[in-house]
Amino acid sequence: MKELGLKKNLSQFILLVIVNAFVGGMVGIERTIIPQFASENFNLSSKSAILTFIVAFGITKALTNFAFGKLANSFGRKNLLIIGWIFAIPIPIILINANLWGWVIFANILLGINQGLTWSSTVNMKIDLVGEKDRGFAMGLNEFSGYLAVGVTAYLSGFLANKYGVTPYPFYLGFLIALIGLILTVFFVKETEPFVKIESKTDDSKSIENIFIETTFKNKTLSSVTQAGLINNLNDGMIWGLLPILLFSMNLDNEQIGIIAAAYPTFWGIGQLFTGKMSDFYSKKKMLFWGM
């Protein structure tokens, strides 16, 4: 008999925390080395041209996140997590062998699908396991593991690029991350949909007919939360795209860029350890206000 709760499902919960660290690791690979990669391999120096890979990633991830809810109900969370990892496998191979910038953009479209499916899967699966009581804590641990891994791999990719060159060794790390994530998911992660059915028996809340319209325009509270999330992700995109370009133009080496690029997601992740649990008993509106 399956039961909701963190203690009752601790082993699966910890496993999903580990899996999400690998999810974060995939996106962290590009946080440091792209300016030099673009300059050396494609003779790109234009900021607007270089940043096209982030635009491709962001749009694809947004669309994948939007579709995730219905896809999860149809195919199951674990299956989507597996599919997300399958999309990750060719990314490092494409980047190693890319001879046109278009291939880099294509690789980041795949990365957007990967992140949309895997990150959404892991956070929802954790929430499924713990139930209503510890949702904030589950979310906090998910973000902690993911963003801490972004920081770690941002530094590691810079270190590898500085020691062995911008390609291929940093991307070998990406391939290893994707492979381990896929193996862990296929053989050890369990589907959490049965836990959703358990919680739905005691949940009398009404379903929303058009979630996009309701959360973006109609419901003022949800609309403001959505806008805050948009601003937060825009900030992240600017740090990801512009900071390494600025540091590269200042003639810092990749390891130095990696240290600076790693600081932001690392401290973001560490902060989630505290703010996640806070949201279970403290006003989320006040937390959002002070955060903004």
Walk through the language-model features, giving the residues of each.
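Juxtamembrane intracellular "pre-TM" segments in multi-pass secondary transporters
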Residues: 1-10, 191-227
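Helix-to-loop junctions at the C-terminal end of transmembrane segments
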Residues: 64-76, 161, 272-283
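Structural signature of the two symmetry-related core transmembrane helices
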Residues: 79-93, 286-292
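Small-residue (Gly/Pro/Ala) motifs that create kinks and tight helix-helix packing interfaces
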Residues: 149-161, 244
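Symmetry-related core transmembrane helices of the 12-TM Major Facilitator Superfamily/SLC fold
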Residues: 169-187
